[in-house]
Amino acid sequence: MGKYLIIANNGPEDPNRATVPFLTAKALVEKGHEVSIWLFNNAVYLTPEGVAENVQAPGLPNLEDLMLFLTMAKKNPIYIGTACAMGRGLVSEDQEALCTFVCGELGMPSQLADFIVETDNVIGF
């Protein structure tokens, strides 16, 4: 099976574009593929406590349900771009979280570069 890296850029301001990367990840996982998700730009706003449960795109599953499937049922890693989170006030300059993240871990650009090299497919949303 394949190894996929999904890069998400959209946050709760656009529920459709925020949800589709996670829906795609779920479909890939259900087919037996290995999936990691990297959150860039406003997508970092999806992981603080209380956000995902309120992201509902018309006709799509609730974002929180997708995140739970990916992180609890299947243990797929979600990475929060540190620079993007820092620029949006979610992380201090010392790289300490300023909020409670319900899922994901902070990721540095060098990690992203490694993931891109190591994966079979990179999908950007």
Task: Describe each model-derived feature in a short phrase.
Residues 1-5:
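Extreme N-terminal starter segment of soluble prokaryotic enzymes
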Residues 6-19, 51, 57:
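Short, glycine-rich nucleotide/cofactor-binding loops
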Residues 18-31, 37:
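Histidine-anchored nucleotide/phosphate-binding helix
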Residues 35-41, 77-84:
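Short internal beta-strands
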Residues 53-57, 96-99:
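Short, hinge-like loop/turn segments at secondary-structure boundaries
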Residues 54-83:
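A glycine-rich helix N-cap at a beta->alpha junction
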Residues 79-82, 88-103:
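Ligand-binding beta-strand-loop-alpha-helix segment within the catalytic cores
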Residues 96-114, 118, 123:
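C-terminal structural segments of small proteins and small subunits
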